[in-house]
Amino acid sequence: MDEFSLQDHPWIELHNLLKVTGLCASGGEAKARIAAGEARVDGAVELRKRCKILAGQIVEFDRARVVVTL
């Protein structure tokens, strides 16, 4: 399980999280794969590309789990 720190930001959009963590090569790929139902947030399929991911949430994507921290 990987960790991603929001640092001083209150949230990050799901498609940006997938891009900056390297789980997707580009924002376009991230958006397409989210729309295809490949991303889960806290165990539920998430189809909103701009879903705000907050500290404490867990994102699952392509056999990877990312815990978002402050």
Where are these regions (language model features)?
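Generic preference for hydrophobic/aromatic residues in regular secondary structure cores
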Residues: 4, 44-45, 64
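A broadly conserved detector of short glycine/acidic/proline-rich loop/turn motifs that flank catalytic sites
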Residues: 10, 65
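A basic, amphipathic helix-loop patch mediating RNA/tRNA/ribosome contacts
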Residues: 12-54
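Short, Lys/Arg- and Gly-enriched loop/turn segments at beta-strand edges
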Residues: 66-70
